[in-house]
């Protein structure tokens, strides 16, 4: 058994209504999505936003031991596929989003929040098929949104199949909001993309890139067909670059859509039901442990994957 430092526990209320606990396990490969406030085009592709986001991503990934596999920065949201090697994903996302928000406020002369008030969508990718599909999904997102005809046409930050595990971004420190005298903010940082560890072992690098390329081609075809059926006109890279950051996306989107916590990929019915059962068991064990903890039993054992209660209150979890 182990327990973590209670830290700021005495300042945190634990009787307020809680969202579902997030399952955080070391070595998990996940897809992260977060939107801008009211879908403003605050991340419109331009050199300054590119530099800010990549620099911050590189610094935070290095600090928290996160492996970056894929990234697409749309004008209204981010997509990341990463592996949480050290079980620090919540810390990583908190720092990344705070720094990106502060920098964006400076660049865009923006008052108020930059990110949507909903917490980040974090989808655990439980199978090799799921990782391949979500890597391709992240790449195809600009096509699905009707912004460009092909993933390779996106003028903002993106990663293509042939760049997986190969590309290294070298980013100079943005001017204006990172203290050059603070060693936390080096003059230059490198962000080297890695291959998802389990897939590199089972597929091999070249076969994995080919599998993602095939899946990307499939998703691009479906996206182009959907854009055509909706009667949309593809905006194009040049018009994307000219979007006002203060303009909002106008395409229909439900206010409260589904927010899945895991993905298994197509044709994985058995794995899906197993994952549902495991998630329900985790949440049930968490609720039962929380009730006992609130009743004063500080020695109660929380289920493996408990993160926030470990961090804030030092609860006991299995080793």
Positions of PLM-derived features:
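Short catalytic/metal-binding and nucleic-acid-binding patches
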Residues: 1-319
